[in-house]
Regions:
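PLP-dependent amino-acid enzyme catalytic core
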Residues: 1-158, 164
Length: 164
């Protein structure tokens, strides 16, 4: 079996039976191994869902730019989707973020802007404010806003075709 692209592998994570930790329970307990997603995180699943929903309703257009404030895992999921689908990515993070995570995002083509941590979220220098401003100012940009994005929540409340 093979997949037409890396995005088809997102969510197709294995179920593993837990044995010792649930030995006293009268049922089978299974765990999804989300680290087998291409970005090594459950966040790949919600990143792809947000991108697909934004494409479907016209918020994200061909050749567009994905803008988000992220500490890494959501950004990696968004970046993987972006590189496959042909979008540019600009991620805004804080100076607390590790160099390795910033470098990982850059390695998949994302531009990363680092903001100070020790400012109020409403401060114009905060990563929340900078990412929102960039989303508003850059032509053909889509500001993901993962914390308030309904697609993020909906992913976990309805059956997903990616749950196999």
């Amino acid at each position: 079996m093979y997949y037409k692209d890396i995005l088809e592998t997102i969510g197709n994570t294995p179920l593993v039976k837990l044995n010792k930790i649930v030995a006293d329970l009268p049922c089978t307990v299974l765990a999804k191994v989300e680290s087998t997603n291409p970005g090594n995180s459950v966040k790949d699943r919600m990143a792809l869902k947000m991108v697909e929903d934004a494409e479907a309703d016209g918020r994200l257009k061909p050749g567009g730019t994905i803008v988000e404030g992220t500490s890494g895992n959501t950004g990696m999921g968004l970046a993987i989707a972006a590189v496959v689908k042909g979008y540019k990515c600009i991620f805004v993070t804080t100076d607390k973020q590790s160099k390795e995570k910033v470098d990982a995002l850059k390695s998949v083509g994302a531009e990363v802007i680092v903001c100070p941590t020790d400012v109020d979220p409403k401060d114009s220098r905060s990563y929340y404010s900078v990412s929102k401003r960039l989303g508003d100012e850059i032509p053909n940009a889509w500001y993901v806003n993962q914390y308030d994005n309904p697609s993020n929540c909906l992913l976990y409340t309805s059956p997903s075709p990616r749950d196999r």
